[in-house]
């Protein structure tokens, strides 16, 4: 516990918060070939690998993921949400932040319904999260 005098002399240091999605906090200047501090909510990238991985201990499944090379030249692993997808190597995708709790090292999500990624088929509820259009009413 510091004394009042020590606090007057030094003061308290603010804690630096580390980003949950560091690849979104970097930009890239392709003319100068240098990284910049330009953060953005989403980034575009190209799939370099699409596959499945198994989750951590109590869970069991085959979770779909894609390895994505972003427009700022950083390569990240992103989760593909929803049932079924049309992604393959060289597909152009949009990624957002947000980790997957039971997949170690996966800190990003692919946005469904944007760029080359199709929305989830036959989805009725929570459509906006999966890029699904409103179904036509049957009369």
Swiss-Prot record:
Q: Where is this region: Disordered?
A: 1-55
Alphabetized SUPFAM superfamilies for the sequence: Nucleic acid-binding proteins (SSF50249)
- Record key words, sorted: Ribonucleoprotein, Ribosomal protein, RNA-binding, rRNA-binding, tRNA-binding
Q: Where is the composition biased (Polar residues)?
A: 32-42
Q: Name the PROSITE patterns on file.
A: RIBOSOMAL_S12
What are the recorded Gene Ontology BP terms? translation
- Outline the subunit composition: Part of the 30S ribosomal subunit. Contacts proteins S8 and S17. May interact with IF1 in the 30S initiation complex.
**What's the stated role of this polypeptide?**
With S4 and S5 plays an important role in translational accuracy.
UniProt protein name? Small ribosomal subunit protein uS12
Species of the source: Halalkalibacterium halodurans (strain ATCC BAA-125 / DSM 18197 / FERM 7344 / JCM 9153 / C-125) (Bacillus halodurans)
> In the record, what lineage is assigned to the organism producing the protein?
Bacteria, Bacillati, Bacillota, Bacilli, Bacillales
